[in-house]
């Protein structure tokens, strides 16, 4: 490859997940030309860790502020109040991860919708981009997003798992599709989505420490594996890995103003 670098648009690089080798994980990412990583926030409790590591690596790690849908519980309003206070932090590049997750637990179904709307309002007020998590709830999430159509939201549908209709709606409404290591797995539909939408609609992500690509499937994931995802996308689209790197980096820098 020529000069240039990758961006991992979604990775949970917290010390909680890498207690023994955090610095080495960052160094390995940089060695593999993954020079920028966007760090989603999942709850108020994750803020100290996120801000600590982003201060350590200010040129490489870029924090978001948000409440993950599976972290929505009976005290979600107080969590949102704490998170909202940090929106003005000059290092924060976006909001997320927020969204709808009906796969794990529907106990706080209504609260998830309310928390999602609150964070979409933050995006409207601050003009910050979004990292959106949707699992088993595309129709529900899109019904909320459509209320904000006039707000001209932008962002990434992280770890995209929808069909082609959802993909086209997202792209038409200012969102990139976050493509993770799942694209390297055998018998997955994500490769068909990638073929259909093309490289201009794609952001690379690991979702580390989860969803490691083949041949590391089932093991701890890290940002250094982004080139593996890029190689698979290059193969699917019949373009060079250099082009995947260049265009996806431009895509993510445009969305998050990195």
Task: Indicate where each model-derived feature is located.
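Mid-domain alpha/beta scaffold segments of enzyme catalytic cores
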Residues: 1-258
């Amino acid at each position: 490859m020529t000069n240039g670098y990758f961006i991992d648009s979604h990775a949970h690089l917290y010390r909680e997940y890498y207690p023994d080798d955090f610095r080495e994980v960052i160094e390995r990412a940089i060695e593999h030309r993954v020079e920028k990583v966007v760090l989603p926030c999942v709850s108020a409790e994750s803020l100290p860790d996120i801000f600590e590591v982003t201060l350590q690596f200010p040129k490489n790690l870029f924090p978001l502020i948000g409440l993950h849908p599976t972290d929505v519980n009976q005290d979600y309003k107080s969590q949102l109040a704490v998170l909202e206070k940090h929106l003005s932090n000059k290092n924060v590049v976006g909001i997320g991860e927020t969204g709808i997750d009906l796969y794990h637990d529907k106990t706080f179904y209504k609260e998830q919708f309310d928390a999602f709307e609150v964070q979409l309002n933050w995006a409207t007020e601050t003009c910050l981009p979004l990292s959106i998590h949707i699992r088993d709830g595309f129709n529900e999430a899109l019904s909320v997003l459509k209320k904000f159509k006039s707000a001209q939201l932008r962002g990434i549908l992280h770890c995209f798992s929808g069909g082609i209709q959802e993909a086209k709606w997202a792209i038409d409404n200012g969102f990139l599709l976050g493509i993770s290591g799942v694209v390297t797995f055998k018998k997955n539909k994500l490769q068909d989505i990638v073929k259909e939408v093309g490289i201009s609609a794609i952001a690379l992500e690991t979702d580390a420490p989860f969803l490691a690509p083949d041949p590391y499937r089932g093991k701890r994931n890290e940002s250094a594996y982004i080139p593996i995802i890029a190689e698979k996308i290059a193969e699917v689209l019949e373009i060079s890995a250099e082009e995947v790197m260049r265009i996806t980096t431009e895509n993510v820098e445009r969305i998050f103003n990195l």
